[in-house]
């Protein structure tokens, strides 16, 4: 039997459901999610393998007009995937009209010479007539290889989209072992799970001002627990105070919620220590960006 494989980028504006889609396909969380725009900062690889195929999905940061060096990194990281994939899933929301951000992405896709499948997500939120109008609007902007409406949250039509990708794969190698689901190390996934809880529990500028660094991660032979020390980086003293909370209550809640997800991922009991440090204006300093895992080697 012929084995098929290929690389697929998931592109779109912030908050259109790219990570929700990837997690649904993979059957577990490998990309963090929140209702905050620009939740995904790094390219996240999800490796979907069956006995006949391997589809390597690359979930990218939401493409937006950057205001910081971190924003520049995120947008360039997203566009760089166009150089390394066989197919692009361009995801748009069914419940929002096409905007300037979509048009900007479409112009880049036209120049990329890569087959593009339009994925219209969040179909559970709109009337069928609105969905058809949305599809017609995008169809007039460029030639798509396929147009597939889905609900990533509810799973509607997701398996059909995977089947379409499979049908269009070429014969190829199995690039990764069958049991590997991502290329990111455990430390990265741990840091993302802590950051996800900060996103869920804070508001305004704080979610965008936070980075998480895992300082150490090792098993304690006496307790048989994985001991993790993680530092939450912020840009201002006022942000540090909010994340710590009254009597340390907020930091404790962040740690408790993150620990549960980390234990599920690792399949081990975890002892998680979290600290908060101030690093002023880190989002505009390339050395700090590199230290916190946002470096140009990604693209």
From Swiss-Prot:
* Membrane topology of this protein: Peripheral membrane protein
Q: Where in the cell is it found?
A: Cytoplasm; Cell membrane
This protein is called what?
GTPase Era
One Gene Ontology term, aspect cellular component: cytosol
Residue ranges of the region described as G1: 12-19
Name the family.
Belongs to the TRAFAC class TrmE-Era-EngA-EngB-Septin-like GTPase superfamily. Era GTPase family.
- The principal location of this protein is cytoplasm
Q: List the top taxonomic levels of the source.
A: Bacteria, Bacillati, Bacillota, Bacilli, Lactobacillales
Q: Which residues bind GTP?
A: 12-19, 59-63, 121-124
User: What exactly does this protein do?
Assistant: An essential GTPase that binds both GDP and GTP, with rapid nucleotide exchange. Plays a role in 16S rRNA processing and 30S ribosomal subunit biogenesis and possibly also in cell cycle regulation and energy metabolism.
Known InterPro entries for this protein?
G_ERA_dom, GTP-bd, GTPase_Era-like, KH_dom-like_a/b, KH_dom_type_2, KH_sf_prok-type, P-loop_NTPase, Small_GTP-bd
Domain named KH type-2: which ranges?
Answer: 202-280
Protein species of origin: Streptococcus pneumoniae (strain JJA)
List, alphabetically, the Gene3D superfamilies matched. 3.30.300.20, P-loop containing nucleotide triphosphate hydrolases
Q: Which residue ranges are recorded for the region named G3? A: 59-62
Looking up PROSITE patterns in the UniProt record yields: G_ERA, KH_TYPE_2
Residues annotated as coiled-coil are none
